[in-house]
Amino acid sequence: MGTLEIKGASLSQFSTGTAQSPWLPLHLWILCSLLAFLPLLVFIGAADCGLIASLLAIYPSWLSARFSVLLFPHWPESCSTKNTARSGALHKPAEQKLRFAQKPCHGNYTVTPCGLLHWIQSPGQL
């Protein structure tokens, strides 16, 4: 008497637990999902003015200015130009660079339920 074959595994293999499932176990799906979204989580988690301005300073000044305006429309001008102004990457007059660099950059971002970043001003800095 033969054994019942189900997608390449016999019934006896299923009863002993030696058959290989074509699907990943749940914990592997969760791990892969977390790894896929890790860069986004790190970027949102590190939504500190100085750190994001440093990351944006890697790009050419015209790209970083447009990039920060598109992503963070409520971001104060001093945050998007803080580090690039000090490095001289912006092609603006020296007095304008100095004005950008001297502006204080206070406050934090928070993630709303819609997933948008909003600038939260410190109470003493309004």
UniProtKB/Swiss-Prot annotation:
Primary location recorded for the protein, binned into one broad class: host cell
Subcellular location: Host membrane; Host mitochondrion
Membrane-crossing segments per the record: 24-44
GO biological process: symbiont-mediated perturbation of host apoptosis
Record keywords, A-Z: Host membrane, Host mitochondrion, Host-virus interaction, Membrane, Modulation of host cell apoptosis by virus, Transmembrane, Transmembrane helix
GO cellular component terms, A-Z: host cell membrane; host cell mitochondrion; membrane
Subunit structure as annotated in this protein's UniProt entry: Interacts with host CAMLG; this interaction allows efficient apoptosis inhibition. Additionally, interacts with vGPCR/ORF74 and induces its proteasomeal degradation.
Function according to Swiss-Prot or TrEMBL: Plays a role in the inhibition of host apoptosis to allow completion of the viral lytic replication and may thus favor the maintenance of persistent infection in infected host.
Protein name: Protein K7
Organism this protein belongs to: Human herpesvirus 8 type P (isolate GK18)
Upper taxonomic lineage: Viruses, Duplodnaviria, Heunggongvirae, Peploviricota, Herviviricetes
Gene label: K7
